[in-house]
């Protein structure tokens, strides 16, 4: 099933239970300059559900790749694989020291908005879900241009949502409904879920998800106020 998201009135994520660890995928961005700045190494990142042990996706040259077994926040195997493809990637200028700055430093882009790069959407496919299972997902976005629009679509879900503006300006902070979105109680129809991002220059910085073994035992966490040191992004000439 092809679905698009509805806007949530409140942004929250179900608390990860002991047997439902978080899984995080971070896109490092253009690897030519300062790759380390876009790598989450030993840091905690995620402004809605902070976690460690992020999986770093190197996408600096061909913007395509895969990870055979994503590591969970506990450092153990998740049994979930990831494969991604996009026409372009980019990164911020300056430095990144905290985990959240490192996550927002690099991103994979849809339709780069320049004659230098080909057009096309970003697709990320996660495989290894159990059909009918529930999970939560958080999407973190970034951009190198003011007002870029991004539309996210998830396939193989029994849920819906809508397009949204991924953020304004050269500031890599995460803002609810603008540069980060949390979706709760998603239902997998098959064993894989594909996230597609379209738009002009829209960038995907990271994805988190948390399988929920027992929905009745989940506890909602409110959003914490977590400040990020903003760093400027540089537009491609």
Question: PLM features: what roles do these ranges have?
Answer:
Residues 215:
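Residue-level detector of conserved catalytic or cofactor/ligand-binding positions
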Residues 129-137:
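Extended extracellular/luminal ectodomain segments enriched in beta-structured repeat modules
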Residues 126, 139-142:
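A short glycine/threonine-centered beta-strand motif
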Residues 127-130, 185:
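Short, flexible loop/turn segments at beta-strand junctions in immunoglobulin-like
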Residues 23, 40, 141-211:
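Contiguous ligand/interfacial binding patches
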Residues 58-127:
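Surface-exposed, low-complexity/disordered Ser/Thr/Gly/Pro/Asn-rich loops and linkers
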Residues 17-43:
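Boundary/junction segments of secreted and surface-exposed precursor proteins
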């Amino acid at each position: 099933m092809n679905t698009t998201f509805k806007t949530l009135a409140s942004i929250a994520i179900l608390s990860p239970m002991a047997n439902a660890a978080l899984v995080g995928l971070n896109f490092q961005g253009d690897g030519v300059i300062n790759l380390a700045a876009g790598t989450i190494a030993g840091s905690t990142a995620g402004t809605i559900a902070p976690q460690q042990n992020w999986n770093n996706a190197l996408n600096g040259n061909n913007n395509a790749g895969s990870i055979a077994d994503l590591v969970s926040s506990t450092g153990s195997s998740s049994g979930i694989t990831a494969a991604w493809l996009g026409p372009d990637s980019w990164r911020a200028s300056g430095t990144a020291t905290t985990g959240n700055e490192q996550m927002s430093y690099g991103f994979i882009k849809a339709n780069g908005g320049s004659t230098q790069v080909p057009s096309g959407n970003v697709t990320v496919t996660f495989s290894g879900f159990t059909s009918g299972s529930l999970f939560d997902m958080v999407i973190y976005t970034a951009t190198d241009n003011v007002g870029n629009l991004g539309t996210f679509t998830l396939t193989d879900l029994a849920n819906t949502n809508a397009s949204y503006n991924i953020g304004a300006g050269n500031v890599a902070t995460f803002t609810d409904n603008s540069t980060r979105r949390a979706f709760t109680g998603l239902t997998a129809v098959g064993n894989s879920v594909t996230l597609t991002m379209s738009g002009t220059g829209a960038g995907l910085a990271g994805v988190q998800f948390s399988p929920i073994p027992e929905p009745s035992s989940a506890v909602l966490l409110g959003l914490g106020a977590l400040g990020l040191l903003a760093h400027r992004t540089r537009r491609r000439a």
